[in-house]
């Protein structure tokens, strides 16, 4: 049976709730963890069929985990379960290789619907995400500006908005201070901002803090 699940989320209560729901529906939860590095380790060792993954996790963010899982070539599907705004993250997750995206603000039973669809070979994303990809958007809105950021740049922006220093960000992402400074410079350029205050305002305006 293709029903082995790995849960990666840094909220223990939510992990427990998802585990109970999935086991009730016949899925076998073979592992769970609160960070990206351990998540990758478990995925390599136990090779789940489905990874239920949050984006804002410590040590290695969810988008990076998706990319690394893809590079490993493991026969698994990734379902993102996150509180991050779908307007900014759903398309990015799809492009990174995720098969589904569910917002934590939805009824948690939506996770089961998504898991079943994903394991049946379908993708499961908000309808607006797919329609936006078909139509495109030429307006220079915040979301358009943010959409051109790399996954790493987006993570740095979020951490800056949370008040973290360059050193804290460097430690969190396993980067040098110089590399973080380079990312900050790129963010200022790409987001048409003139100061760190403007960057943080933009991030908070778009629920990235």
UniProtKB/Swiss-Prot annotation:
<dbReference type="GO" id="GO:0000160">
    <property type="term" value="P:phosphorelay signal transduction system"/>
</dbReference>
<protein>
    <recommendedName>
        <fullName>Virulence factors putative positive transcription regulator BvgA</fullName>
    </recommendedName>
</protein>
<dbReference type="InterPro" id="IPR000792">
    <property type="entry name" value="Tscrpt_reg_LuxR_C"/>
</dbReference>
<dbReference type="Pfam" id="PF00196">
    <property type="entry name" value="GerE"/>
</dbReference>
<dbReference type="InterPro" id="IPR011006">
    <property type="entry name" value="CheY-like_superfamily"/>
</dbReference>
<keyword id="KW-0843">Virulence</keyword>
<dbReference type="GO" id="GO:0006355">
    <property type="term" value="P:regulation of DNA-templated transcription"/>
</dbReference>
<feature type="modified residue" description="4-aspartylphosphate">
    <location>
        <position position="54"/>
    </location>
</feature>
<feature type="domain" description="Response regulatory">
    <location>
        <begin position="4"/>
        <end position="119"/>
    </location>
</feature>
<keyword id="KW-0010">Activator</keyword>
<keyword id="KW-0804">Transcription</keyword>
<feature type="domain" description="HTH luxR-type">
    <location>
        <begin position="142"/>
        <end position="207"/>
    </location>
</feature>
<dbReference type="InterPro" id="IPR001789">
    <property type="entry name" value="Sig_transdc_resp-reg_receiver"/>
</dbReference>
<comment type="function">
    <text>Member of the two-component regulatory system BvgS/BvgA. Activates the transcription of virulence genes.</text>
</comment>
<keyword id="KW-0805">Transcription regulation</keyword>
<feature type="DNA-binding region" description="H-T-H motif">
    <location>
        <begin position="166"/>
        <end position="185"/>
    </location>
</feature>
<dbReference type="Pfam" id="PF00072">
    <property type="entry name" value="Response_reg"/>
</dbReference>
<dbReference type="InterPro" id="IPR039420">
    <property type="entry name" value="WalR-like"/>
</dbReference>
<dbReference type="GO" id="GO:0003677">
    <property type="term" value="F:DNA binding"/>
</dbReference>
<keyword id="KW-0597">Phosphoprotein</keyword>
<keyword id="KW-0238">DNA-binding</keyword>
<keyword id="KW-0902">Two-component regulatory system</keyword>
<comment type="subunit">
    <text>Homodimer.</text>
</comment>
């Amino acid at each position: 049976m293709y029903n082995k699940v790995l849960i990666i989320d840094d909220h223990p209560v939510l992990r427990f709730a998802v585990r109970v729901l999935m086991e009730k529906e016949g899925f076998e939860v073979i592992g769970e963890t609160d960070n990206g590095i351990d998540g990758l380790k478990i995925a390599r060792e136990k090779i789940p069929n489905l990874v239920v993954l949050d984006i804002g996790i410590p040590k290695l963010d969810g988008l990076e985990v998706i990319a690394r899982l893809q590079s490993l070539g493991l026969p698994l599907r990734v379902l993102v379960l996150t509180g991050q705004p779908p307007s900014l993250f759903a398309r990015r997750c799809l492009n990174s290789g995720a098969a589904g995206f569910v917002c934590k603000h939805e009824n948690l039973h939506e996770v089961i619907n998504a898991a079943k669809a994903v394991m049946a070979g379908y993708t499961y994303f908000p309808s607006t995400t797919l329609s936006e990809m078909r139509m495109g958007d030429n307006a220079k809105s915040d979301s358009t500006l943010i959409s051109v950021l790399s996954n790493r740049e987006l993570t740095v922006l979020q951490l800056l908005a949370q008040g973290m220093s360059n050193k804290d960000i460097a430690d969190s992402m396993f980067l040098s201070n110089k590399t973080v400074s380079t990312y900050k410079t790129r963010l200022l350029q790409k987001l048409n901002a003139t100061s760190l205050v403007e960057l943080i305002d933009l991030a908070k305006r778009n629920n990235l803090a």
